[in-house]
Amino acid sequence: MAYPTPQVTKATGAVFIPEIWSDEVIAAYKQNLVMANLVSKMSFKGKKGDTLHIPKPTRGTASLKAASTAVTLIADTETEVLVVVNQHFEYSRFIEDIVEVQALSSMRRFYTADAGYSLGKQVDTSIINLGSGLQGGSGTTAYNKAVLAGDGATPYVAGSTAGTALTDAGIRKMIQTLDDADVPMDGRSIVLPPVGRNVMMGIARFTEQSFVGDVGSGNTIHNGRIGDVYGMMVYVSTNAATPSTATDRIGLMFHKEAFVFAEQLGVRSQTQYKQDFLATLYTADTLYGVKELRDEAGVAFAMLG
């Protein structure tokens, strides 16, 4: 018997091959991650269970050894951080055949890019929101342990104390807060809302050639990049938190061990043809957990939005 025609082949059905969608989604997802690349990341992929146990040993202290005496034993009880992996987010589209047939090929590129953007934004938002618990904070949108960006020390009180513009003195004071807590200098970052970047570009110390030494196209005035500030890379994210006072925005200065991101299921892309609807269901999803790891390793600061 002759082979039936027409056939659905790999060429004619290429738009339904999951691997193509998946590759494009993962690329877009990685492009839109800011916070996830700046914190401690632990892979939970392929492992069963819903909770990750991370040992958190207490630092010991040295004791003076006197002659003819026994050594001093350290009897600390070690603790652990529990990361519950319960953040399961998905992005789905239902694409009818008539649209698939008549639409430009760019439609798929838009959906995959949009899926990557949406999932990446959600991951970053989950991590950024952990900043409300730094320095013993309540973990709410009140940000009761945040400081004012202007001086880096005055407590922020949502609803009664407005955020202030970021200053060089404020940055240096927050650096001292981390230094006083013995937070390692290597691995620190600053994440700002766009308004924070706007303010920093107006601070001569961070932009003008006489201070930073950059000339030509390497100067911040020409390229808009802040780059390295006192040994910390500066990143801008529109996902920066908005506290309960909606006119303010929250920035973070932190070490990578302030937060942990545990990923059990990386971005997965799937398609399923629904013949009864003559349409294709497309879904991208991810499963992860986030947690504050070291409370003293970061500072949240409030600025005017």
Model-derived regions: residue spans:
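N-terminal "assembly arms/tails" that initiate or stabilize quaternary assembly
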Residues: 1-81, 296-303
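Structured, hydrophobic secondary-structure cores that serve as assembly/anchoring elements
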Residues: 28, 53, 59, 71, ...
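Generic, well-ordered alpha-helical segments
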Residues: 46, 65, 74-75, 85-87, ...
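Extended oligomerization regions of viral-like shell subunits
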Residues: 48, 52-56, 169-263
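Alpha-helical scaffold segments that mediate packing/assembly in large oligomeric complexes
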Residues: 98-177, 301-305
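A conserved acidic, glycine/proline-rich C-terminal tail/linker
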Residues: 262-271
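Extended, compositionally biased alpha-helical segments that mediate assembly or anchoring
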Residues: 270-305
